A protein has these predicted regions:
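Predominantly soluble domains enriched in secretory-pathway, periplasmic, or organellar proteins
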Residues: 1-424
Length: 424
């Protein structure tokens, strides 16, 4: 069947490809069953120090490049893409137009020397990142090291929860709590609390005090609007803690060993831990998925997948499907058997059972997924296939690959995102 007959959509997709040092952007236009690929002009490398390189913010409605100067904090819009612009890790606030850009600091100390000296690293907040009206709102110094972000907000079951941003700090073993309600001017985009994740009894050295830095190594941070709690995974201790956003206190602690990250289902009912077993079998990496029920406080679902290392996770618009991309990990012998090009699709309506309904082999690892949604339903899913420089287009209902589009030269990293869409 002709792809245009199967799903008569007109869409424009942006495709970033890079090698962690330099990159470029292609634009994929699909209309009337035909696809055209164009490339943004490239600006030579800036040759600036790493912390001074321009930060890539997004693209405008007119396909111009939005950049943030990390020194002057000015937003610049231009037609060309600086080859060494930094594609920072971004977390989007689900209830506003604000995006949060993570700065993990330098590798040696975890400090953002430009903004925070030797006192930590930072997050920067920009509004309207897909518009020529993009606005820089501020840079906030937090703890040191790699960050993750979660955003709390009021819901029907937790109406008193405030709008707050939680930022985990890997090297410090802390969480920075930041006001995220512009109506509360005194706290807005300011650190209002720091949560020390130390568990003294699990520290190999120390005097039993609540030390920071510590070995909590937080990596896995989510908010459930159903329970009204924040869930943080302490990788160093093998525990998951529950935080009350009304007072930022740790109110529960659960053993949760063998996991390296968390994600939460769109309805907030289940927190899913993902991890990998590289020790029990010298020839195989075994992916691990554990389903924690926020209402019962139990873990009723556990799944293992041989020769899989989970990379990124995504949900469809309905919240009925989970998509997991895969990557490389393990010893050379284990990597011989690893399915690094797999895209796994699960039926979330079967939870707490992790029901796998489709496995695609894309030919290489997916760099990212993007979703075309209509009236609250996912019509198409796009996978940026980094090493091949292609995009796989997947039907959101049948889960079948509709077509694969050649976009650019392959590279180690890629990211695709939707710029516009409508039905023809």
């Amino acid at each position: 069947m002709n792809p245009a007959d199967r799903n008569p959509m007109k869409y424009t997709l942006a495709y970033y490809t890079g090698n962690r040092k330099t990159g470029r952007i292609a634009i994929v236009d699909h209309a009337n069953g035909e696809t055209q690929v164009s490339h943004l002009a490239i600006e030579p490398e800036s040759n600036l120090e790493k912390e001074c390189k321009p930060v890539f913010v997004g693209l405008t409605e007119g396909r111009e490049v939005i950049l943030l100067d990390p020194v002057s904090k000015e937003i610049r819009v231009q037609p060309s893409f600086p080859e060494d612009a930094f594609p920072a890790h971004i977390y989007s606030d689900p209830n506003s137009s604000r995006d949060w850009f993570m700065n993990d600091g330098d590798k040696e100390t975890g400090n953002d020397r430009l903004n925070c000296g030797d006192q930590g690293s930072s997050v920067s907040v920009v509004a309207d990142t897909s518009s020529s009206a993009a606005a820089y709102l501020g840079t906030i110094c937090v703890g040191r090291g790699h960050h993750q972000a979660a955003f709390t907000y009021p819901s029907d079951s937790a109406p008193q929860v405030p709008h707050t941003a939680y930022i985990s700090n890997l090297k410090d073993g802390t969480i920075s709590v930041i006001g995220n309600d512009p109506r509360q001017a005194g706290d807005y985009l300011k650190v209002v609390a720091t949560i020390n994740l130390c568990e003294p009894e699990k520290e190999k050295e120390g005097d039993g005090s609540m030390a920071a830095p510590n070995n909590a190594f937080p990596h896995g941070l989510v908010y459930s609007p159903l329970s009204g709690k924040v869930y943080n995974l302490n990788n160093g201790y093998g525990t998951m803690v529950l935080i009350d956003p009304l007072n930022h206190a740790i109110v529960e602690r659960h053993d949760f060993k063998g996991h390296s990250n968390l994600f939460v289902t769109p309805d907030g009912r289940y927190v899913i831990g993902r991890g990998a077993d590289r020790k029990s079998d010298p020839r195989h990496v075994i992916a691990r998925l554990s389903v924690f029920d926020v209402l019962s406080g139990e873990t009723p679902g556990r799944t293992e997948l041989r020769d899989i290392y989970i990379s990124k996770y995504y949900f469809n618009a309905q919240g009925s499907k989970l998509y997991l991309t895969t990557g490389k990990s393990g010893t050379p012998e284990q990597q011989k058997n690893l399915k690094t090009d797999a895209l796994l699709i699960f039926d979330l309506t079967a939870l707490p059972e992790m029901k796998l309904i489709k496995e695609h082999r894309l030919g290489c690892s997916s760099g990212s997924l993007a979703f075309l949604n209509e009236d609250g339903r996912t019509s198409l899913v796009f996978s940026s296939n980094s090493e091949q420089g292609t995009v796989s287009v997947i039907d959101g209902e049948s889960d079948e690959i509709v077509e694969t589009l050649a976009v650019t030269e392959g590279a180690s990293h890629s990211r695709a995102w939707l710029l516009s869409s409508h039905r023809e």
